[in-house]
Amino acid sequence: MIDSDGFRANVGIIICNQYGQVMWARRFGQHSWQFPQGGLDDGESAEEAMYRELYEEVGLRPEQVKILTSTRSWLRYRLPKRLVRQDSKPVCIGQKQKWFLLQLNGNDNNINLNSSGHPEFDDWRWVNYWYPVRQVVSFKRDVYRKVMKEFAPTTLAFQVNDTGRKRNRPRN
């Protein structure tokens, strides 16, 4: 679904573990890393698209995650001109994204990058919370910074255990 301004409706997914680390995935056959993301199908809500993409890209089912929060608004980024396909109608100049922060309820073994038979990613790892902002491709960096800043209080709050003390987090 491309809107009248040329932006494709899309969802972004940040999966965090009990230590506040986030899942960082390498695009199949490339050297670029990013969070899972994908477009909305016609008639699909952002949450429905998120669950579909979650399974297609990383093999996780709704019962294996918990939605902690989502962005208050849609965030946009423009594609570099070299990536804009002029032969498609309508022309897509970028993405508008609704982001979701998920807590992994299962274990790492539940993550399956080949669940759909057409993998988007060929590797993944847990990284510290702010690492992706510095490492993502430059045209997505501003959106990543905004999302991570918006989600930071939720991530910190969920890391606190029942005694009110922060859990020890491994270094990476």
From Swiss-Prot:
Gene Ontology CC terms, in alphabetical order: cytoplasm
Record bears the keyword Glycosyltransferase: no
Keyword terms of this UniProt record: Hydrolase
Broad EC category: hydrolase
GO term, biological process aspect, one: mRNA catabolic process
Protein's UniProt keywords contain Hydrolase: yes
Cofactors required: a divalent metal cation
Enzyme Commission (EC) number: 3.6.1.-
Domain Nudix hydrolase: 6-149
GO molecular function term, any single one: mRNA 5'-diphosphatase activity
Functional description taken from the UniProt entry: Accelerates the degradation of transcripts by removing pyrophosphate from the 5'-end of triphosphorylated RNA, leading to a more labile monophosphorylated state that can stimulate subsequent ribonuclease cleavage.
The protein's name: RNA pyrophosphohydrolase
